Amino acid sequence: MSEHRYLPDTRPYPAEPVKRELLMHAEQAARGGAQGKLAAEALRAQIYGMLSQNFYLNLSVALSMTPSETAYGTMMAALNDVLQAKTDEEIQWFALPVILVAGCKQAAALTAAAPAPELSACLANYPHTRALSRATWLPQLFTAGQISEINAGQWFKAKQNAEAAAEFAASLPQNDSLPLVEGQSVSAAFALGYGGRELTATLGKNLQEAALPLMQVWQQALSAPGVTLFANPLSPDSPPAALTDAGHMRLRMALDVFTANSIRSIRLQSPRVGVVMASQEGGRLVFGFNATDSQFELQPQTFTWPLSPMDKIEIVQQNFLDLLAECQVENIRLLHDPIGENDELPTYSQAVKLPGHNPLYGDGRHS
């Protein structure tokens, strides 16, 4: 495989390996095999010990020092396992995300009331989601920002028993509405709930045939005058995992919308669309759209994807290329070298003179 097949990873990993026991377990667990299984068990035990002793800060520091996306994913998998209900007394928390693509001519708001009865009734119809219909649902929806402010230590305390769960639920912020900016926007909202250990088996599974009915529940519950809305339901999962999945899907759908709009506007004035893909220092991917010929160039249209610690660049890149293929765009330039943190992305006519290749016709091996 060519080193230039995928966009380079510019996330700021530590320059030197950090010799922390937690990180060493994570790296070994990521490698798999018999030793990897032992390391994964040790990793879970250590995270459990940290959270039991209220040492969340140590875990947070270790997560910030992970040397790779793979190691970070291994640590998060261990954390999500620790946050699961393990006994009949413990509580299983879950989040049910929905991605909202909205359009409005002026700033607006959606209701933040969770459609709990409708969600429960819908999920009760399918064996793989039925247990969620017996859960306790919180009466309101939460934003991604609000979910991200809850740390693993708080989730760990809230799972100890029913009393702790109810106390935690009562302490969460109250929302009257979910604000929308003027124009098009893509955001995530979350329904939260909790129940017994039986819920664990429902988490992280594909919605399958429940997806369309669930979408209809969200559409009806969140519709508002003057707002064009499309709701994309995601699978229920533990709150940290749901936050990660929703963050990725929100950006993916935002990029889809931006791409379609950009291609449409360029084709109104130029016969050929040129697309530039690049990494940017500081952990970002940048996608630019313009005419292929400099004499037809328009105002640059650029989308920036800030990479989360668990984003897989190869997946982001392939999803984008699949979308371009659907839009019948063939003039693509993937730049081999990252652009500077404060540099503008070159236009297509500039990019073809820089080291790079068209990923539709090779992996950059001979470019």
Model-identified regions with their sequence ranges:
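Long amphipathic alpha-helical coiled-coil/heptad-repeat bundle
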Residues: I47, S52-N58, A62-A152
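Charged, amphipathic alpha-helical stretches
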Residues: M1-M75
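Cysteine-rich micro-motifs
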Residues: D363-S367
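Extended, non-transmembrane interaction/recognition domains
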Residues: K105-Y348
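Short functional micro-motifs and their immediate structural scaffolds
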Residues: N358-G362
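Short cysteine-rich clusters marking metal-coordination/redox-active sites
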Residues: S349-H357
